UniProtKB/Swiss-Prot annotation:
The lineage of its organism: Eukaryota, Metazoa, Chordata, Craniata, Vertebrata. SMART domains: IRF. Keywords: Acetylation, Activator, DNA-binding, Isopeptide bond, Nucleus, Phosphoprotein, Repressor, Transcription, Transcription regulation, Ubl conjugation. Its main location: nucleus. This is Interferon regulatory factor 2. The modification N6-acetyllysine is found at K75, K78. Changing K293R: Some loss of sumoylation. Increases IRF2-mediation activation of ISRE and H4 promoters. Increased inhibition of IRF1-mediated transcription. Further small loss of sumoylation. Great loss of sumoylation. Abolishes sumoylation. Residues 314-324 have a biased composition (Low complexity). The gene is IRF2. The keyword Repressor applies. It comes from Homo sapiens (Human). Acetylated by CBP/ p300 during cell-growth. Acetylation on Lys-75 is required for stimulation of H4 promoter activity. The major sites of sumoylation are Lys-137 and Lys-293. Sumoylation with SUMO1 increases its transcriptional repressor activity on IRF1 and diminishes its ability to activate ISRE and H4 promoter.
Length: 349
């Protein structure tokens, strides 16, 4: 292979102008459109002198074939020529004018002028590279200029001082902390925000002189839940009001029946009273069934004691004592049963 050889485009022009290869000719010399015979060896068979003289000449020119030394290989010559034609940037195929079938198959190509030649894919013009390098170099300079413009409004004292920039992840605020050794006591630990964020942030600053925060009891006053209806009914049954207790205290008297003490109100109520239902039935005590027997001869509340004062003592007391005794025994037995069941839970009245 020769060290220096002619490039393919001028070599093709020389071959076309020689008129030594059949089928190779100019179709439009002004537009540089030419025709190359392109036979298919697999279909029609190879005639080296008729179908492959151009491919053979290119193989000899590139040093791939030496006449009289190498065996003829028109198929390889054609493949090498096609690859060389496709790699040229200044020659393109005119596919609408090419005929690829038949005994007279040929291809039409056009040589492009310098103005229409596309640049190579792997290379870029120097101007684009230089512009890109300049653009990359100018970006840090612009950022530093923007930072200096943000501090340019300060006095010359701050401009001379060295500053450190804190870069935080996902931070859009540049914070410049000025050196503390060069500042007075009035401007120590001062932070200058060059680019404040769009969203305002509320920051609470407290000092030692500020008052202590309000206690939790002041922030959340004590609240008492309302009393349920069941509790109200229970309290009304078990706990008397002040007026009732004031009126009823002087009238309560103690009585001893079968070794147990009971209270009775002789002035306004019957002789013996059972404790209220609230004292027997509550939320924390088992449900009990209490039976109260009604008196056969109830005493009116507005009558004086003892009843039937007009009657003789012997006649009036005898039936009353005989009739009231079983009633008293019945009440006492009921109270005794209930007190034995509840024992410690029921307090004595």
């Amino acid at each position: 292979m020769p060290v220096e050889r002619m490039r393919m485009r001028p070599w093709l022009e020389e071959q076309i102008n020689s008129n030594t290869i059949p089928g190779l000719k100019w179709l439009n010399k002004e537009k540089k459109i030419f025709q190359i015979p392109w036979m298919h060896a697999a279909r029609h068979g190879w005639d080296v002198e008729k179908d492959a003289p151009l491919f053979r000449n290119w193989a000899i020119h590139t040093g791939k074939h030496q006449p009289g030394v190498d065996k003829p290989d028109p198929k390889t010559w054609k493949a090498n020529f096609r690859c060389a034609m496709n790699s040229l940037p200044d020659i393109e195929e005119v596919k609408d004018k090419s005929i690829k079938k038949g005994n007279n198959a040929f291809r039409v190509y056009r040589m492009l002028p310098l103005s229409e030649r596309p640049s190579k894919k792997g290379k870029k013009p120097k101007t684009e590279k230089e512009d890109k390098v300049k653009h990359i170099k100018q970006e840090p300079v612009e950022s530093s200029l923007g930072l200096s413009n943000g501090v340019s409004d300060l006095s010359p004292e701050y401009a001379v001082l060295t500053s450190t920039i804190k870069n935080e992840v996902d931070s859009t605020v540049n914070i410049i902390v000025v050196g503390q050794s060069h500042l007075d006591s009035n401007i120590e630990n001062q932070e200058i925000v060059t680019n404040p964020p769009d969203i305002c942030q509320v920051v609470e600053v407290t000092t030692e002189s500020d008052e202590q925060p309000v206690s939790m009891s002041e922030l959340y006053p004590l609240q008492i839940s309302p009393v349920s209806s069941y509790a109200e009914s229970e309290t009304t049954d078990s706990v008397p009001s002040d007026e009732e207790s004031a009126e009823g205290r002087p009238h309560w008297r103690k009585r001893n029946i079968e070794g147990k003490q009971y209270l009775s109100n002789m002035g306004t109520r019957g002789s013996y009273l059972l404790p209220g239902m609230a004292s027997f039935v509550t939320s924390n005590k088992p449900d009990l069934q209490v039976t109260i027997k009604e008196e056969s001869n109830p005493v009116p509340y507005n009558s004086s004691w003892p009843p039937f004062q007009d009657l003789p003592l012997s006649s009036s007391m005898t039936p009353a004592s005989s009739s009231s005794r079983p009633d008293r025994e019945t009440r006492a037995s009921v109270i005794k049963k209930t007190s034995d069941i509840t024992q410690a839970r029921v307090k004595s009245c």
